[in-house]
Structures are given as structure tokens and as C-alpha cells.
């Protein structure tokens, strides 16, 4: 169904939430190579586990402030006082385990950067730098492998479904639904420059 602006979008995009529409149109599925942005999306996807993405997206600005603009070095060094402040912050999701996982995952993220040169090089090596198009799934062999590897490295809240959503968000997977005005555009455009 066409929206008021004449475009067809993925069915999950909420036509009543401008933030969600902008996220769908301007971010989701567009390949990311910036490590800070990759860390931000990893943390947000981990917090989304068991919740709606819209809930997380609506709190994103507060997460940015609370988590020092997703600076992985700062997050990896959080003290118990900082963790307590996060657990008391009504503007973010205050799940104790997810907050602790953000610190644990920041440490593992930094270790991966040391090993691969960047987290971008790590995440994109799984597809040889190419965008993969697939829709209608919540996990895949790719997300299974990455999830298993990240868990082995000590990360938390990185099950295959979370990692699949992460890969979609950062554009490793192009999953815009057939009919969506963005379907396959990212893969065709970005793979032509690889």
C-alpha cells in the first residue's frame, strides 16, 4: 500500500512515527563502516532483545547521552557508580543485565578492533565486503556463525536473532521487502563500489 507521500515501505515501518519512518528511509539497511556507529547499533540491538525496536528507537537520544555517545572505550571503563546511574536513569531501558552486557560487549568490541584493525573489517569480512540480499527471515547461517563467534569472544545478548537484526540495521543484509521503494537499491548501489 502506498503511503501519503506516494512511497511503498516495508510493512514494519510505523506510518504514525516520524522517527521510525526516517530510520527506515535513511538508516536501516544502508551499509555502515564507521566503528562508532557499528558499536551504537550493536548496543541498541542488544537492548532491543525481547522488546520492540520502536521502543528502543524512541529512547535512542537518551541512550546516546547516557552511554557517552557510544564511545566504546569510555563504555568499557564504566565504574559501578556509572552502572548504578544507568540503572537509575528513567530515560533508557534499565535492565541490569543489558546494562552490564553493554560494558562487557564494549570490552570485546575493543579486542576485536585490535585483532582486525576495526570492527568494520571484522563484521564485513563475513561477507567479503558485500551486501547480501534476503528477506522474510529472523536468522540465517550467517547470523548463526557471527553470533557463535561473538559469544566465544565474551559478548552477551548476541543471539542469532539479535545479530540478524543487527546485520540488517547496519546494511550487511539488505532486507527491504519486495515492493518497498528501497528494496535492493542498497545492495545494487553499494556492491557496485566494492
Which residue stretches match the model-derived regions?
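HhH-family (HhH-GPD) DNA N-glycosylase catalytic core used in base-excision repair
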Residues: 1-194
